[in-house]
Design a protein with these regions (language model features):
Chain B
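Bacterial Sec-dependent N-terminal signal peptides
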Residues: 1-23
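N-terminal, motif-rich segments that launch catalysis or mediate targeting to/interaction with membranes
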Residues: 21-125, 132, 137-279
Length: 277, 279
């Protein structure tokens, strides 16, 4: 029994280390898959040897220990100044804070998108770059991947529930949806893949870079939702979670639609084109 | 079964499950999803328009999640009371359900927010009232009504590692014991994929009052299973010597009842929504 609990706890820790947890990455990919055009779906399925993008929803994390992909280790976060301006990768790389040093996700995303758009890649390179885009664009709809240089201390925020200490960022990554809904992968689609064409147009309007910059003010405000050290009981935790799940579920949906838009743009010549910058 | 129970205990511990509500999230979502599968296109379109295009499943546990923000809801009775002989309804829950359904019937006259909240109440409470953990039976032949079976009936699962009670078993416990990995789509697929029209007609015949009375009769049968639960022999802890042990076979029987109630509640919920929103 004790062994069982330790194993599960260890698994939870592993998932926590990979930004959105595995079930959310799968949910986002499933929403994206649900919104692919037939042509894009056909081309992508061919690229993945018959599998869907859901299978590879967190490719970057699944291959974190592979030497060939070690350059993706700093493709974790995007850093912003106190004015919500993006901190360039070169500057971020020299920062004393590790989360800021790892804030080269936007550059990674852009380089993969540029490579895919320009063509001339092998099948394997095309597959890898597409799967980078899926993992990273998912993560860039998770507030914990936005490192605000003026709020670095707030990244250490924590709370107590029944006298046990929990990290706020880990809550976002693992429980911001699961704290309210026990959705399985297809259930994410049933619940969240139901935007109107007008809503989808609004979500996917602009360039990939503008999506990321546009997320920053909301994700900055997420830090206002917790006074570090707060002690929750069952009822106050529930009240607090009620403020969080509408944001997290909406971000999951938005990520899914935007991934679909960029994949349609890349793999269906008749689909609307999405600008990178 | 023993391993399954141990696994369940571990899952509940790790998940920090502190809230116990009828059926739990998965049960309520299953009922609402079964209902959704049986809605007419018109009814589905109309009810989803009222809740910002979302599925009714999204709001299946909204009442539990948001109860703390609306203190008055905590006072709503979530237990149906029945006479054990006549199965006549006694108490307030019927009045609450009647008022909720009456409000739904006039949904076009309600404000947007009142319409939404009424739908949230209905989708949740209708499921609650199909949960055997939310039925209390009384013998009224004496001077004072006597509650025959208490929902705080305590027992051990066969591993003797975990003390449970009747209410907790029905509040999510039984569903997670049966299929800890299933989501609401899995449950609906398993229960609702091959039912006959005859079954639907039979279960949805009559009024909602008849249906809840039917739940009360079922609950009586469930209570009777507990009556044949053996008491613990040679209990080490004298304080617990009267507790019973529910074994795997009994859990399977409870599972049958739970599955039947989830399905019936979904089919009946669909009938009411179709009647009101299908026009």
């Amino acid at each position: 029994m004790k062994k069982f609990i330790i194993i599960i706890a260890a698994l939870c820790c592993t998932y926590n280390a990979s930004a959105w947890s595995r079930h959310i990455h799968a949910g986002i990919a499933a929403i994206a898959h649900d919104n692919l055009t037939e042509e894009a779906k056909k081309n992508i399925t061919e690229l993945l040897d018959g599998k869907s993008i859901i299978y590879h929803a967190q490719f970057v994390y699944d291959n974190a220990d592979n030497e060939a992909y070690k350059h993706t280790k700093v493709w974790k976060n995007v850093a912003f100044t106190d004015k919500n301006k993006i901190l360039k990768a070169k500057k971020a790389a020299k920062h004393e804070n590790k989360d800021v040093r790892n804030a080269q996700a936007l550059e990674g995303l852009i380089s993969s998108l540029n490579a895919l758009q320009s063509g001339g890649l092998t099948k394997e390179q095309t597959r890898d770059n597409m799967l980078y885009v899926i993992t990273i664009l998912s993560d860039l709809h998770c507030p914990t991947h936005y490192v605000f240089t003026d709020l670095l201390e707030k990244r250490k925020s924590f709370y107590y529930f029944n006298d046990k200490k929990y990290s706020y960022l880990t809550y976002w990554e693992s429980n911001s949806v699961r704290g309210t809904f026990n959705w399985k992968t297809n259930e994410f689609v049933h619940q969240l893949s139901r935007k109107t064409p007008e809503q989808v147009a609004d979500i996917t309007n602009g360039s990939v870079t503008s999506w990321i910059i546009g997320n920053a003010p909301l994700y900055r405000s997420v830090y206002d939702l917790l006074n570090t050290g707060t002690r929750f009981d069952g009822q106050t935790l529930r009240l607090w979670q009620n403020k969080i799940y509408p944001i997290s579920t909406e971000q999951v949906a938005v990520a899914g639609y935007r991934i679909a838009a960029i994949l349609n743009s890349l793999f269906d010549s008749n689909a609307p084109q999405v600008k990178i910058k | 079964m023993k391993r399954l129970i141990l696994t369940l205990i571990a899952i509940l511990t790790i998940a920090n499950i502190t809230e116990c509500f009828a059926w739990g999230r998965d049960g309520h979502a299953t009922i609402a999803y079964i209902a959704e599968r049986h809605l007419t296109p018109k009814a589905k379109e109309n009810i989803e328009k009222c809740i910002d295009g979302r599925s009714i499943v999204y709001y299946a546990s909204w009442l539990d999640n948001h109860r703390a923000e609306h203190k008055s809801w905590g006072k709503l009775s979530h237990v149906c009371h029945y006479d054990i002989h006549s199965f006549e309804s006694i108490g307030k829950p019927h009045k609450y359900m009647k008022s909720t359904i009456n409000k739904l019937k006039k949904y076009r006259e309600l404000t947007d927010s009142a319409r939404k909240v009424t739908i949230y109440h209905f989708v949740h409470s209708f499921g609650d009232y199909h949960c055997p953990g939310h039925v209390a039976l009384y013998d009224r032949t004496g001077e004072k009504p006597k509650r025959i079976h208490t929902s705080s009936y305590d027992f051990y699962l066969n591993a003797k590692k975990s003390r449970w009670n009747y209410h907790k078993l029905w509040d999510a416990g039984i569903i997670q014991i049966l299929h800890p990995d299933w989501g609401y789509m899995d449950w609906a697929h398993a229960l609702d994929s091959s039912i006959s029209q005859e079954y639907i007609d039979k279960v949805t015949a009559g009024t909602w009052e008849d249906w809840l009375q039917d739940v009360a009769k079922t609950t009586h049968t469930v209570y009777n299973i507990f009556n044949r639960v053996p008491k613990i022999k040679n209990a080490e802890d004298a304080l617990d010597k009267d507790l019973s042990v529910v074994d795997g076979q009994m859990l399977n029987e409870f599972g049958e009842y739970a599955s039947e109630q989830l399905l019936n509640a979904g089919l009946r919920m669909a009938k009411i929504i179709n009647e009101i929103f299908g026009e």
